[in-house]
Amino acid sequence: MAEEVWMGTWRPHRPRGPIMALYSSPGPKYLIPPTTGFVKHTPTKLRAPAYSFRGAPMLLAENCSPGPRYSVNPKILKTGKDLGPAYSILGRYHTKTLLTPGPGDYFPEKSTKYVFDSAPSHSISARTKTFRVDSTPGPAAYMLPVVMGPHTVGKVSQPSFSIKGRSKLGSFSDDLHKTPGPAAYRQTEVQVTKFKAPQYTMAARVEPPGDKTLKPGPGAHSPEKVTLNKPCAPTVTFGIKHSDYMTPLVVDVE
């Protein structure tokens, strides 16, 4: 008996699914856009006209008004409110009393020079002070620059020399013992290099803010003279007495 050749664990069987090695094209791997319908239509083909369907429209006989929800005044028309004339009663307006001049503020006897022709008259007054003061500068108001010395203006100055005393620094009379003493140096405060002690300031007493104006007292008011809420008592005014010997000025004469 010849020995059987070992063929391994694989045995011929029916495949459970498609084997991609058996296909030369990708096959159903790619989804081609459809040529029917409207959604996802292929862009390489013309698309046929499509129609949309919807429900039946609403009935026209249906009432779309809010109904008796709003209470409309029956007196309101398209031209406005239909009412009769109405009047309102208010208080009398308070008219401001103007301070007009009275008869005593006029002097008609002084108006003759404005109404009738008068002779020319001249007025004599004191001499004005503006002509006495001469506003032009005098000879003493000018200060001419000097023409001598090194500080000449507009001129060429000659060389000048200054003479001063001889310095004792480095000379035979220089006193070498004059060195600065302890009092020649300024003493530095201790608080600059050491801890500074606490300091307190004493100020004046602070008064609280208040109103210090003068207020009227009880004697400054006169309630008996107030007639805002009560009728005013009758008052009589007196005028001036006109003279019987002076003819009044009559302007409007026709």
UniProtKB/Swiss-Prot annotation:
Keyword Cytoplasm: yes
Any single Pfam family the record assigns to this protein: SHIPPO-rpt
Taxonomic superkingdom: Eukaryota
Lipid metabolism is among the record's keywords: no
Record key words, sorted: Cell projection, Cilium, Cytoplasm, Cytoskeleton, Developmental protein, Differentiation, Flagellum, Repeat, Spermatogenesis
Matching InterPro entries: CIMAP, SHIPPO-rpt
Major place of residence: cytoplasm
Subcellular location: Cytoplasm; Cytoplasm, Cytoskeleton, Flagellum axoneme
GO biological process: cell differentiation; flagellated sperm motility; spermatogenesis
Tissues expressing this chain: Testis-specific (at protein level). Expression restricted to the germ cell fraction, absent in somatic cell fractions such as Sertoli and Leydig cells. Expression detected in the third week postpartum (23 days) after haploid germ cells developed, expression increased with age. Expressed in the tails of elongated spermatids sticking out toward the tubular lumen, and in cytoplasmic droplets still attached to the spermatid tail membrane. Expressed in the tails of mature sperm, from the connecting piece proximal to the head, along the middle and principal pieces, down to the distal end piece.
Location of the region described as Disordered in the Swiss-Prot/TrEMBL record: 207-228
GO cellular component, one term: sperm flagellum
Any coiled-coil regions, as ranges: none
STPGR repeat extents: 180-205, 216-241
Quaternary assembly: Microtubule inner protein component of sperm flagellar doublet microtubules.
Note: 'Shippo' is a Japanese word for tail.
Purpose of the protein: Outer dense fibers are filamentous structures located on the outside of the axoneme in the midpiece and principal piece of the mammalian sperm tail. May help to maintain the passive elastic structures and elastic recoil of the sperm tail.
Family: Belongs to the CIMAP family.
Protein name listed in UniProt: Ciliary microtubule associated protein 1A
Organism: Mus musculus
